[in-house]
Amino acid sequence: MKINHAVSARDQGAHLNKSDFGEGGIYPILYSFFDQNGALDRAAWRQQIEAVIQAGAPGIAILGLITEVSALSVEERRTLVTWAREDIADRVPLLATIAGKDLAEARALAQDAESAGANALIIQPPLNVKCDESELIDFFSGIMKSVSIAVGIQNAPEYLG
């Protein structure tokens, strides 16, 4: 599928500065950790953030495929964004991946991530829904129009469809 047009974050008023994203490099995507009761493990999450910052990561990405975002509840996703911003404490940029079952959910998650302090978003197609090109354009641009921070689209058709 080739998308010939899209709405960029810049078109929506977001302006990227090199300083927004550090010196460049690889942003690790964090894992989700759970305790023996199946709840998110805050201590393990914090330890992971400290480890990647101490190792020199120029930024951190969360809620990607490796985080098993599709297995997390909406509330768990919101919690991880909040924890990440608190634990990172503006030391490096935070990129939050947005995955929702539909546009309304994805838009709400994007706005929540922006409000929580994410520097940029990585958006995925709607979860478990097959979309044609026009529907994907509407979905992605609908999210982009709802936030003022930078947005990138994750392309992983073997996992996301």
Where are these predicted regions, by residue range?
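Active-site beta->alpha loop and helix N-cap motifs at the rims of alpha/beta catalytic domains
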Residues: 4-161
